[in-house]
């Protein structure tokens, strides 16, 4: 539960750092309208997000979940999966490259990839939306060292987005974000 939170997300990368249960993932859910606040308001470009069309908001605010959840089908199908991406003319190769995977992966079965590769497909899916804001919920939590390094490398190469990275790893926050916001028990502590 969040309490009295007043936070502006600006261009560049912001890390939300805190222990489990501190409200980091809850905040991401509010930013992408996977949940609405019980009280208070979440603004996007000065407008209450509850006044915005949910699908339009989710096109503008991409989300990479903690655990990859590919849909049945190819990597290309998965990159094209999401609000506004049903148009098969969307080229999945550029976002896949940005996410650190070669386009040779496009015809592979997404369900047969490693967890690290699946996580990069989830990143490519979010990037295919060409979002203004990218939300990352512990994107490397379930990855081994090599896969984690590959995802971090892909994230480090992104430019022109507002990125919100949820992590409990201070070193990762320092590597990837220009701004670190600490949460404890639903409150800002910095």
Question: For each predicted feature, which ranges?
Answer:
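Conserved ABC transporter NBD signature motif
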Residues: 40-48, 57
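Conserved catalytic motifs of ABC-family nucleotide-binding domains
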Residues: 67-77, 81, 86
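Conserved ABC ATPase signature
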Residues: 109-113, 117
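Hydrophobic anchor residue at the start of the ABC signature
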Residues: 123
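Catalytic Walker B motif of ABC-type/P-loop ATPase nucleotide-binding domains
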Residues: 134-138
């Amino acid at each position: 539960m969040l309490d009295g939170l007043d936070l502006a997300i600006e261009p560049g990368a912001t890390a939300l750092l805190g222990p489990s249960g501190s409200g980091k993932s809850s905040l991401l859910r509010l930013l992408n309208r996977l949940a609405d606040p019980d009280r208070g308001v979440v603004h996007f470009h000065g407008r209450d997000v509850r006044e915005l069309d949910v699908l339009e908001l989710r096109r503008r605010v991409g989300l990479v979940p903690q655990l990859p959840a590919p849909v049945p089908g190819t990597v290309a199908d998965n990159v094209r999966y999401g609000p506004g991406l049903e148009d098969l003319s969307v080229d999945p190769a550029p976002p896949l490259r940005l996410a650190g995977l070669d386009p040779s992966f496009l015809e592979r079965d997404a369900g047969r990839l490693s967890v690290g590769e699946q996580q990069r497909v989830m990143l490519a899916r979010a990037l295919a939306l060409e979002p203004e804001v990218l939300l990352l919920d512990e994107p490397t939590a379930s990855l081994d060292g090599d896969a984690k390094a590959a995802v971090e490398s892909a994230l480090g190469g992104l430019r022109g987005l507002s990125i919100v990275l949820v992590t409990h790893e201070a070193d990762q926050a320092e590597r990837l974000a220009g701004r670190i916001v600490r949460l404890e028990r639903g409150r800002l502590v910095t």
